[in-house]
Structures are given as structure tokens and as C-alpha cells.
């Protein structure tokens, strides 16, 4: 299971399937929550098959986790969610980042 210390996270990629509205809502929600928590992290959006190689964490819907794992660099942390709004795993990610915790792949 991959992990990363919160202090090492510089870039989070929200992986999507087609770039439709739902994944953009998740990205914008993450940006808003990260800003509110005072986090200095870049949050980008990319197709699950084209994860930027400098991504420290990839956030994706469970249905895209296989494609995201295949496209992401080997040690990248993959955080999966099931609900596009108010998913507990996304809340935990922001909480772990702001508290300086170690973040694990889900």
C-alpha cells in the first residue's frame, strides 16, 4: 500500500473519465476545502489514463481506480471516492493534509 507524508504533497490530480461536470465539481470542492484549510497544494484535473507524472496523490471514483493505477507513477497514492458530493474519503484527505498525517492509498 502506497503512502506519503502530508508535508511532501505538492500536487493532487483528480482523475476523471470524460471531464464532465461531476469530476469538475469534485475538483472545485477540493480546491475550496484546501484553500479554507490553508493548504499550499496544486490540484489539477486529468483523464484517468493521462495522470501527470509529478502527481503525488491521485483522487478518483472507485470505477476509475484501475485506469488511474495503471497510468499513475508506481508509488503514487490513490485515494478513491464513491460519492461526488461530501464523500468521507475526500474529507479525510483534506483533514490528513491539514493535520500533517501520513496519507495512504485506499
Predicted regions and their residues:
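Fold-independent oxyanion-binding glycine-rich loops
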Residues: 17, 61-62, 81-82
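Ser/Thr/Gly-rich flexible loops in soluble cytosolic domains mediating phosphotransfer, phosphorylation
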Residues: 12-14, 77-106
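Conserved active-site segments centered on acidic
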Residues: 2-48
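Short, conserved loop/helix-junction motifs that constitute active-site signature segments
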Residues: 71-73
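Short, polar loop motifs at secondary-structure junctions
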Residues: 46-48, 62-66
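Short, hydrophobic beta-strand segments that form beta-sheet elements in well-ordered domains
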Residues: 43, 57-61
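Short glycine-rich, flexible loops that bind phosphorylated cofactors or substrates
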Residues: 21, 66-67
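Alpha-helix C-terminal capping/helix-to-coil transition sites in glycosyltransferase folds
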Residues: 53-54
Amino acid at each position: 500500500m502506497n503512502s506519503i507524508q502530508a508535508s511532501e504533497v505538492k500536487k493532487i490530480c483528480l482523475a476523471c473519465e470524460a471531464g464532465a461536470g461531476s469530476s469538475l465539481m469534485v475538483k472545485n470542492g477540493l480546491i475550496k476545502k484546501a484553500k479554507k484549510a490553508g493548504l499550499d497544494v496544486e490540484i489539477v484535473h486529468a483523464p484517468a489514463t493521462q495522470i501527470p507524472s509529478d502527481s503525488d496523490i491521485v483522487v478518483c471514483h472507485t470505477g476509475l481506480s484501475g485506469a488511474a493505477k495503471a497510468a499513475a507513477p508506481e508509488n503514487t497514492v490513490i485515494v478513491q471516492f464513491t460519492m461526488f458530493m461530501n464523500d468521507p474519503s475526500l474529507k479525510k484527505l483534506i483533514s490528513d493534509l491539514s493535520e500533517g498525517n501520513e496519507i495512504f492509498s485506499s
